[in-house]
């Protein structure tokens, strides 16, 4: 066998093993999520699932209408006969969630003999304070309007199936896929870093405020042949850089597919480009998009473009039929209505498909999530490059959805922050981090100026995670809370870092029985929660607005406890677990560490990148609340962090009598 044939065999073996490994991971992650979800659904009654935010009970059908793609959308609202008030209780539902719609017998005295169980699947399209909208797979799934219903969150198997399908395609020997970029991305060769100087010889920047590192990233990404990695630490203007790259590529007559790991990441780029005049379209359900970018959504463009009047007219006819379905129990009448709806839907989809194809084909830039890149609207579309934002937060199979067959990719992210949030026993390395390690500085551009944090707040993350290369911009390095309008100068507002040290009093897990039931695998610390409340009260008294404050903690149980204490004081601020605040920023961040024990166990905080996310959210003020005796001795890394706090923060030693 010749050496070239041997190499082909080696490459093919590598590809198959690579694909099998990712498919195995997808299967493991899906099984873990399904098992956990089914365990909760079986273990707890619907009333408890509602209190956990995983279900909504005692609902009735409100409005029935037609949505994008001719889908039947039902608004479910609270049934006043069984509920107090009109607003839905607090919940964790969001657009895109897969749900089960079930007949609610649980709070009834008993199930009637002629009643049958209803279990219909749908996808959440909108969550309003008074109703939740769900798109059904079929109009024949519409339950009776007289039925009391519940909506329960399920695992979204479609996302896993799309990843699995993509990796199966990855393994197929299709010449179109096996290009130079493909072998670079799987680690079989170094990236081709040849530069087309003609593309950047006379470059003029749209954004005149770009710094030197941003300009370097723009020029490299435009001119490099196949791969660019933009490493953007917190507050370094990664989105501004990507916007400039897109504008420059379009100016050079390139067609771009822009993807992100989240809807918000994609929408932020669309928002910045909305006034550029570039022909562009945002794929995805409008309920998942920022209101400011809806005019660029495929849904709005299809209803206002060619055939828009026809599409709206058919949609109105379908809505009339849908309203009749919920008002009749007669089987013959319902079958006749369903027949009419099916005919109307055929016409709807015919006109819509033609309109959508024209809109997408005419767009120089197409935006979607990574999963959205596998939608039918993009089938057969060709692009000169793909840009993936938040690439460090995406699973490898997600990234391959838009990448198969592409010749050039620009990945942006920060592998020093949290990696993809998946339920797996194995540590997961994103494509972005893998390529940073394997391809090195040849293809990496580091954004080194941050525009968010006071210099003291950014010092530890810069020294620890970014080789001391992350520097604050002049306009942010000295700013404090007291510099804000209407904020008084106090010890709190004059300090960039505050540290309440609970000094080994071991108050961890001071939870009620209810809290233990709802957050079995979570932790809380009542004492720290009281300190959070105390500190926030001090900031508010100094004139800081509640909207400028956020509470961050590693545990959902602590979030619930703090929210409860603040509610008693009439205080409402944004709060969340560390995993949910990545990408966010506030003037002041209060960080409750929770763990306080004599075995020096720090739990979630053992992941260094989780700490990096938490302490890089604030602009002017970081307040840390925790037990130095537990945290400091957990590892050398945490020893260094506590030493930094003790040397640079205002330290308040707290004893157990402070809040008695």
From Swiss-Prot:
Pfam families noted in UniProt: AAA_11, AAA_12, SMUBP-2_HCS1_1B
One GO MF term: ATP binding
EC number: 3.6.4.12
Gene3D superfamilies found in the cross-reference section: 2.40.30.270, P-loop containing nucleotide triphosphate hydrolases (3.40.50.300)
Reactions accelerated catalytically: ATP + H2O = ADP + phosphate + H(+)
Keyword entries, A-Z: ATP-binding, Cytoplasm, Helicase, Hydrolase, Nucleotide-binding, Nucleus
Record: residues binding ATP: 232-239
Disulfide bonds: none
Top-level EC class: hydrolase
Alphabetical GO biological process terms: mitotic DNA replication lagging strand elongation
Superkingdom to which the source organism belongs: Eukaryota
Cellular compartment(s): Cytoplasm; Nucleus
Main localization (coarse): cytoplasm
GO cellular component labels: cytosol; DNA helicase A complex; nuclear replication fork; nucleus
Description of how the protein assembles with itself and partners: Associates with the hexameric DNA polymerase alpha.
Role played: DNA polymerase alpha-associated DNA helicase which may be involved in DNA replication.
Entry similarity comment: Belongs to the DNA2/NAM7 helicase family.
Protein name (database record): DNA polymerase alpha-associated DNA helicase A
Organism: Schizosaccharomyces pombe (strain 972 / ATCC 24843)
Taxonomy of the source species: Eukaryota, Fungi, Dikarya, Ascomycota, Taphrinomycotina
């Amino acid at each position: 066998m010749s050496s070239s044939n041997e190499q082909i065999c080696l490459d093919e073996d590598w590809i198959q093993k690579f694909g099998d490994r990712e498919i195995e991971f997808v299967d493991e992650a899906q099984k873990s999520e399904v098992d956990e979800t089914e365990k909760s659904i079986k273990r707890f009654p619907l009333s408890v699932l509602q209190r956990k935010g995983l279900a909504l009970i005692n609902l009735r059908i409100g409005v029935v209408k037609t949505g994008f793609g001719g889908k039947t959308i039902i608004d479910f609202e609270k049934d006043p006969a069984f509920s107090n008030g009109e607003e839905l209780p607090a919940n964790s539902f969001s657009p895109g969630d897969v749900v089960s719609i079930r007949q609610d017998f649980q709070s009834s005295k008993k199930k009637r003999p002629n009643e049958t169980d209803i279990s219909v699947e749908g996808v959440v399209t909108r969550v309003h304070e008074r109703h939740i909208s769900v798109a059904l797979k079929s109009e024949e799934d519409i339950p009776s309007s007289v039925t009391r219903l519940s909506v329960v969150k399920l695992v979204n198997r479609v996302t896993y199936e799309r990843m699995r399908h993509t990796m199966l395609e990855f393994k197929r020997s299709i010449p179109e896929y096996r290009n130079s970029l493909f072998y670079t991305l799987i680690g079989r060769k170094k990236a081709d870093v040849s530069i087309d100087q003609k593309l950047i010889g006379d470059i003029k920047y749209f954004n005149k405020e770009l710094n030197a590192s941003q300009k370097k990233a723009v020029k490299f990404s435009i001119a490099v042949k196949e791969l660019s990695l933009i490493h953007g630490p917190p507050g370094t203007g990664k989105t501004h850089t990507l916007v400039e790259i897109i504008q420059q590529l379009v100016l050079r007559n390139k067609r771009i597919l822009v993807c992100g790991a989240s809807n918000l990441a994609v929408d932020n780029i669309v928002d910045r480009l909305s006034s550029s005049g570039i022909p562009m379209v945002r794929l995805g359900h409008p309920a998942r998009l920022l209101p400011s970018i809806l005019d660029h959504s495929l849904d709005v463009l299809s209803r206002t473009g060619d055939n828009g009047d026809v599409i709206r007219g058919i949609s109105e006819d379908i809505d009339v039929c849908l309203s009749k379905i919920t008002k009749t129990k007669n089987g013959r009448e319902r079958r006749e209505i369903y027949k009419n709806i099916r005919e109307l839907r055929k016409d709807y989809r015919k006109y819509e498909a033609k309109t959508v194809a024209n809109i997408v084909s005419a767009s120089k830039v197409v935006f979607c999530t990574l999963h959205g890149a596998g939608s039918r609207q993009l089938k057969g579309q060709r692009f000169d490059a793909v840009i993936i934002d938040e690439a460090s937060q995406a699973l490898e199979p997600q990234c391959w959805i838009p990448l198969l067959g592409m010749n050039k990719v620009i990945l942006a992210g920060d592998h020093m922050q949290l990696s993809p949030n998946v339920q797996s026993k194995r540590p997961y390395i994103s494509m972005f981090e893998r390529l940073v390690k394997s391809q090195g500085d040849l293809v990496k551009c580091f954004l080194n100026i941050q525009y968010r944090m006071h210099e003291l707040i950014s010092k530890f993350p810069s020294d620890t995670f970014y080789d001391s290369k992350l520097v604050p911009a002049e306009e942010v390095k000295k700013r404090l809370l007291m510099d804000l309008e209407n904020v008084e100068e106090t010890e709190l507002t004059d300090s960039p870092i505050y540290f309440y040290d609970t000094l080994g009093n071991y108050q961890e897990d001071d939870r009620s029985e209810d809290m233990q039931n709802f957050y079995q695998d979570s932790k809380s610390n009542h004492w720290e929660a009281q300190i959070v409340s105390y500190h926030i009260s001090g900031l508010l008294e100094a004139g800081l607005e509640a909207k400028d404050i956020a509470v961050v903690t590693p545990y959902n149980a602590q979030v619930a406890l703090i929210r409860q204490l603040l509610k008693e004081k009439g205080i409402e601020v944004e709060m969340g677990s560390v995993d949910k605040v990545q990408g966010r920023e506030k003037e002041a961040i209060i960080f409750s560490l929770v763990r306080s024990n004599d075995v020096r166990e720090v739990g979630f905080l053992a992941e260094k990148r989780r700490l990096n996310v938490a302490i890089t959210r604030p602009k002017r003020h970081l307040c840390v609340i925790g037990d130095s005796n537990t945290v400091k001795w957990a590892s050398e890394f945490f020893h260094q962090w506590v030493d930094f706090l003790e040397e640079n923060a205002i330290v308040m030693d707290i004893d157990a009598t402070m809040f008695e």
